[in-house]
Every structure is written in structure tokens, then in C-alpha cells.
Amino acid sequence: MNAFPRLNWLLLLCTLPLVAAEPAAPASSAPTNDTAWLQAKGTLLFHDAFEREETGNGLKGIGNGWESATADRIPKIKQVDLDAGIMKIASATKEAGHAAHIHHDAGFADGGVIVRFKFPGLNKAENLQLGFVDRELKDVWAGHLCYAILSQTDLTLTDRKTGSMNLAVKKKHADDAAAKRKPDPEFEAMLKTKTQVTPLKADTEWHVLTLVTEGYEMRFSLDGKPVAAHRSPGYAHDMKRWFSFLANSTVWIDDVKIYKVR
């Protein structure tokens, strides 16, 4: 292997956001029930049961502090319908050039969300991507920190702060493409450690998910049962300013709670 490309990506790693060395995970340290952990240890920052009507299709039409980031791209198309206490999302992804993206203020280092949701079965590839954002973070694309992504077949947990959304990583990929260089296999292997995929078959029933970050770990539970946990430095970011979710087609949200533990 030519030493110079490897040296270049090692130097690139030095430009990624500095974080303390990851502590070893204590044996059996994670709570067995993250819903109970949030409720017992956390402060409820926000709750919405969507018992109202939307006021229009614009940025703030959902009300109660929510913002629909893609609404103003297609003001004549309704992407959110508040119906009988349910936020029914129907993303106009093709028309907007982006999946429906809805967010609300959060504000914690450790904490998380409890969300009651349902895939209504109106489209084949319904998915739900939810996680945390810090738009004040300038070295990560749009401040995207970390996400859980529910598809019809699996659950993905991903650290985007030190992974795919890091601007230094994006620059390396762009530079490699411009120079017609093959991706460095060691660098790509490092990036793969930022993501974990767990098989999880979707259905059309109502479920309650819990997504938390605690230090270097992000955990996902469904109906009170742990499904997946992943450790990566980006999860330890000290300010998750927004709770954010995206949908590529249709998903229904019945209840959202945001908790701060630290």
C-alpha cells in the first residue's frame, strides 16, 4: 500500500471533533428498561399528544413548537394531518426533493424520547428515522448527530457526528472521487464501525419506541424490550438541541415525550 494515502486519512482522523477517550463499558451497566430509566432519572422537557388541528402547511403549521423543515418547499401540499390526536405524516418526498423532516427543541447530553408510532401500511417501504441534531455544530453537515432508522426489515443505529455527516469525512470522499481514487479500505472499515444494523421486522400495529443516549452509547427499545445498543464517540455530544424525525412516505405518530437525564 502506498503510505501517503494512509497518512492522509490518519491526518483526517485528527481533524474529527476531539472527544475524550471512550471509557470501557461497565458490565451490565445499561438499564434493562430505558422507558423506566427516563421516567425515574429524567426531567420531562416536552410532551405532545397532538390533540388539536394543524394551522396550515407551513413551517410552524403543526403547532406546539414543532417545525416542518421541508414544508415551505411545497406550500400547496399537505404533508402533516393532525387527525383525532394522531399526527399523520405523508411525505411528498419527490416533490420536495427531501423526506419530510420535522423537529422540536430538546436540549440534553444524556436523555431521550418515548414515541408511540405506527406504520399504517399505505406504502411499501414505510420507514421512520429519528434522532438528535445540533445546528450550532459547524463541522457536521446540518448538525446531524445520531439517528435510529426503522425500515420494514431492520433497525439501524448510526453515529453521524463522527461518521457520514462529518464534513472532514465528506471532504475526503469528495476528494477521492475528484481524483478518481478508490476508497481507502481501512478508512471505510473505520466508518462502518459508526453504524450497527439489527434485524427487526415491521408491522402495522401501534408500538412505543424508546431511544436514549447515555455517554458513548445509544439504545433503542420497543414496547419496553431492549432491541439494540451501539457505542460510538458521537453519541456523547454534550448538547442534543433538537429531536428530529424524517419519513420517506407515511407514518403515524400518536404521542411524543422528550426527557433530559443530564
Predicted regions and their residues:
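Extracellular carbohydrate-recognition regions
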Residues: 25-65
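Flexible glycan-contacting loops in extracellular carbohydrate-active proteins
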Residues: 230-258
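Beta-strand-rich interaction surfaces with strong enrichment in secreted/lumenal proteins
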Residues: 35-36, 99-106, 194-201, 242-243
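Short, aromatic/His-centered strand-loop micro-motif at the edge of beta-sheets
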Residues: 164-208
